[in-house]
């Protein structure tokens, strides 16, 4: 891992936020080893508050990304418009938690697309979750996907968290997978990335920030086994592009020799064994060989 983006619940203004203060300390301590980015995740109604412009200025001062939780029923054209205008005014990229529901009537993503195109927004837009898109009727879904592509929006699908949470009802087996329609999105030219989202918290009590695990579960849930090499970019180059990290996420001539070498004979072998040994390379030098058991031992010591 050479870069990581996290979402900070921003209830207070960033300069008074314990989350932002702690993040700044960690970002400084790790700056020579990791690129850390923070998204200020706020409820969408915050755009109507008098302090929103001040919040955006503080986010920009910290090289942060403007985020918003766009849940069912919260999105209105006026709110989305204010969000985009504030982002443009302060030179902020957007990272949006949008339509995390299997309700096909959710319209947050469609409002984001329409607003981005109308404003000709110059910043980078990331749309995370987008679960409702998979439940829309095919003509409506295809039209919206075309709009996403035209607006240049990056889509981040969360196979672990969304597979765990979506269509969840007590005493009932889920019928729906909750995964955004990643195959259709990629076919339309949209940059698709996979990510872990929650790790060992109330929303997803498992995981350990392992992108191989994310890739494996995306292959299973999305039935992507036909092109594992092609979809691997959704766990490296795709996220790098969504984060604005030019040239990162790929091995190329003249680039940094950062990679992970797995003890596997092929894709099937890699996805079949959860304890595959790996060698982490940074700047062409191995940091060591780890097995899943060794990682677990180190975590328990910590």
Q: Which residues does each PLM region occupy?
A:
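Short glycine/threonine-rich loop-to-helix capping motif typified by GTGT followed
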Residues: 13-19, 169-170, 205-209
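C-terminal cap of metal-dependent C-N hydrolases
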Residues: 241, 253-302
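Active-site clefts of carbohydrate-active enzymes
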Residues: 154, 161-163, 167-168
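Divalent-metal coordination cores built from histidine and acidic residues
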Residues: 1-45
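Active-site-proximal loop/turn and secondary-structure-junction residues that shape catalytic pockets
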Residues: 10-12, 40-45, 72, 100-104, ...
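Histidine/acidic residue-rich metal-binding segments in metalloenzymes
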Residues: 18-33, 48-126, 130-154, 171-194, ...
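Conserved, mostly hydrophobic/aromatic
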Residues: 59, 66, 97, 155, ...
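His/Asp/Glu-enriched, well-ordered alpha-helical/loop segment
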Residues: 93, 114-125, 165, 176-262
